[in-house]
Amino acid sequence: MQSSHRILSRLLHSPRKGYIRASVGGSVHFLALFDEKDNGFVDTTHRSFSSLIRSSSHVRGLISTNCLNKGLGVRCSVSLDRETPLIDTYSSHRNFFTRAKQVKRIEINDQHSQRAVTTALWCNFLVFSLKFGVWWTSSSHVIMAEVVHSVADFANQALLAYGLSSSRRAPDALHPYGYSKERFVWSLISAVGIFCLGSGATIVNGVQNLWTSSPPPNMELAAVVIGGSFLIEGASLLVAIQSVKKGAAQEGMTIRDYIWRGHDPTSVAVMTEDGAAVAGLAIAAASLVAVRMTGNPIYDPIGSIVVGNLLGMVAIFLIQRNRHALIGRAMDDQDMSKVLKFLRNDSVVDSLYDCKSEVIGPGSFRFKAEIDFNGQMVVQNYLKRTGREEWAKMFREAAKNGDDSAMLNIMSNYGEEVVTALGSEVDRLEKEIQELVPGIQHVDIEAHNPTPTDPSL
């Protein structure tokens, strides 16, 4: 006697690859990887699903397997002999799934951030060249501070550009949620660079030259280059501000909220760094004017110290912002409330427990919840879809004939279908949550068996 066990692979979020992990008889788990080919999905774990099962020791009674492409996923039918059930677990899949995968790219709507970084990169290189030339001829301490500032800015923009590129890598086995947080890492490194190289070195340079005995030479040339740098940095700042506005519009935030709580740190980092650059140039100009008017050279290193403190404040702000993103920040309260309200109002949900969310990348979230399902509503929804009369007829016939074996078989089949119906309800909830908040890329819903001490949300 044979029984057919169906396994559904959810490939909705991975149109080219998928894997299944299922249990048969509650005692065995097996896992397979599928690649999408022209003629459907093909098992690539061990050439065929049959060889995968047979590779496990103590596995007996395998009759046949069949895997077909069913549009949104893969349907696999495994026929087994009831008398020789699967009794072992296939565990060697771990080595297979932890191999390094070929790096792919994913599309992220961050053109505004990329444009801001690229513009700032070239502008900082041009400004650095101008400032370095002026410092070489004038030996101004405040201009030296601006040279160091430009070096730090250029290096930091390069780090941000690398972070943008690396964050677009597609998810793989080692990082199933993707690499979107890479931009947080490199933004944090960039901020540390501003603090150490930009702020620290600039302040030290100013303190060391507080007792300079003579004003810096060639101040006129320095003033001209400061003006030119101001125009270049100002243009880059305008591009960064436009980038921040677009990012805020995409996330439905005000510009102020986006600067403090937005999910993409890149454009904010560019804007704050360019803003500090423009302010630093204004401070440098004021310092040179003060030296020229008073003849006192102390205003030159004082300007350097002020610029260094400005960079330090910018760096601390960026460090804190990226730190919160890296340690696992929840998604916005508005989106979270929207999801919880939807779940509480759904007919199959009795109670919610341990609901959590996390930002896994710019505009991308993960949501998790434990749900106490309303079993009666799950069954009613299932019977509405399949027809209750068919099941009632089978139960009546088994009861009329007094066939306990047939009754047990019907009850087993009915129980299996109810479990499948619960899975369908979970799939429906996950899909509707993602439609409600499109930024939620991953939804994990678990069935919860409540106890009197459980704190319901």
UniProtKB/Swiss-Prot annotation:
Keywords: Membrane, Transmembrane, Transmembrane helix, Transport, Vacuole. Residues 137-141, 205-220, 289-297 are vacuolar. InterPro entries: Cation_efflux, Cation_efflux_TMD_sf, SLC30A9. GO terms for molecular function: monoatomic cation transmembrane transporter activity. Its main location: membrane. Residues 1-115, 163-183, 242-267, 319-457 are cytoplasmic. The chain crosses the membrane at residues 116-136, 142-162, 184-204, 221-241, 268-288, 298-318. It is a multi-pass membrane protein. It is found in: Vacuole membrane. It holds the Pfam family Cation_efflux. GO terms for biological process: zinc ion transport. One of its GO terms (cellular component) is vacuolar membrane. It comes from the Eukaryota. Involved in sequestration of excess metal in the cytoplasm into vacuoles to maintain metal homeostasis. Belongs to the cation diffusion facilitator (CDF) transporter (TC 2.A.4) family. This is Metal tolerance protein C4.
